[in-house]
Amino acid sequence: MFNIIKNDKNSNARLGILELPHGNVATPCFMPVGTLGVMKALKHDVLEKLGCDLMLANTYHLYLRPGIDVIKKYGNLHNFTTWNKNFLTDSGGFQVFSLSNFRKIEDEGVDFKSHIDGSRHYFTPESVFSMQETFESDIIMALDICSPYGIDYDEASLYTNITTSWARRTLCAYKNRKEGYEGLLFLITQGNFFKDLRKRSTELILELNSPGIAIGGISVGEPRDRYLEILEYNSSLIPKDKPKYVMGIGTPHYILDAIYNGIDIFDCVNPTRIARHGSLLTDNGILRINRAEFCFDTCSVERECSCTLCTRYSRGYLRHLFKSEEALGVMLASEHNIHYMFRLINKTKNAIMNDNFVKFRKLYLDKYDEGNLNE
């Protein structure tokens, strides 16, 4: 199911193989986010050529549109979308709980209003698992409560307890899954930014012995030093034989921090989100193509990059596409940024294989500061 093939000698970084129903996934792995089963501005064949083996889709959004009955008619999410690689489906918990003025949390589940039309809906751990079972997701995420940064201890403790209770119920549903379904369940540790809650949550989740473990509730607006503190602490509590997933991180410096601490999987909308606004990831930092300085620039965005944009088009032409609001500009920039993330991961894998990851990370972080990487 998960095999570690190389441990870095100077950090907790490692190389692994995660065996999933639609093919093996080499870790560390950056997961592009295809919320509705599709990447914004990227066709499946482009993703496949880039080497994507695992895409994230979102249960909350798919539940609302097109609806579970539509996907069931096609047999599963893979058939509906024609994506023949792996899907990880988020439980939708983050989206539901971000609707703070439109939801009510109970021990049984959560009542919420649709962001589309205001209609009321109710999610339980069992119903969310059932939806993902219908999708035949390759990785299923349990329903959890992602509590915001800055809440008090009592509220964080309450949400952590509910998350643990929901994890037990999800595991029970998973053990009674339909015959032949081989997707892997990842349970989620919470605890906000209180170490004793993190420890309690992780210990209780580990007792349930799910195939994989996710660290939730970090990278939610906290300072980077707090992120690093909880990331390192929570990861250290999880046995090394478990695949580890940190949810919602996707900037290069956060990913390198995660890999350093033994994290195997991560996802974020950031690369394609900033691409849609004309910001491109390069080895020299973010290039903002809308700036006037690029109007007459005949160079490619990045010389060493082999994506469609960099092998064919100039910076000046890409700027023209964005200024003219041509869809091709967004498509090219999105492909470039995803390709960049995959290239970064491949460089990271080579560094781990050669026990050179610590040096590689330091050189990268010395070159890129946090402000330079955020839009």
UniProtKB/Swiss-Prot annotation:
Gene Ontology BP annotations: queuosine biosynthetic process; tRNA wobble guanine modification; tRNA-guanine transglycosylation
Enzymatic reactions: 7-aminomethyl-7-carbaguanine + guanosine(34) in tRNA = 7-aminomethyl-7-carbaguanosine(34) in tRNA + guanine
Pathway: tRNA modification; tRNA-queuosine biosynthesis
Binding of Zn(2+), residues: 305, 307, 310, 336
Disulfide bonds: none
UniProt keywords, alphabetically: Glycosyltransferase, Metal-binding, Queuosine biosynthesis, Transferase, tRNA processing, Zinc
Cofactors: Zn(2+)
Cofactor note: Binds 1 zinc ion per subunit.
Binding site for substrate: 90-94, 144, 190, 217
Enzyme class at the top of the EC tree: transferase
Region (RNA binding): 248-254, 272-276
Any matching Pfam family: TGT
Superkingdom as given in the UniProt entry: Bacteria
GO CC annotation terms, alphabetical: cytosol
Active-site residues from the entry: 90, 267
Recorded GO MF terms: metal ion binding; tRNA-guanosine(34) queuine transglycosylase activity
EC number of this enzyme: 2.4.2.29
Protein family: Belongs to the queuine tRNA-ribosyltransferase family.
Protein task: Catalyzes the base-exchange of a guanine (G) residue with the queuine precursor 7-aminomethyl-7-deazaguanine (PreQ1) at position 34 (anticodon wobble position) in tRNAs with GU(N) anticodons (tRNA-Asp, -Asn, -His and -Tyr). Catalysis occurs through a double-displacement mechanism. The nucleophile active site attacks the C1' of nucleotide 34 to detach the guanine base from the RNA, forming a covalent enzyme-RNA intermediate. The proton acceptor active site deprotonates the incoming PreQ1, allowing a nucleophilic attack on the C1' of the ribose to form the product.
Subunit field text: Homodimer. Within each dimer, one monomer is responsible for RNA recognition and catalysis, while the other monomer binds to the replacement base PreQ1.
PANTHER family linked: QUEUINE TRNA-RIBOSYLTRANSFERASE
Listed name of the protein: Queuine tRNA-ribosyltransferase
Naturally occurring in which organism (per UniProt): Borrelia recurrentis (strain A1)
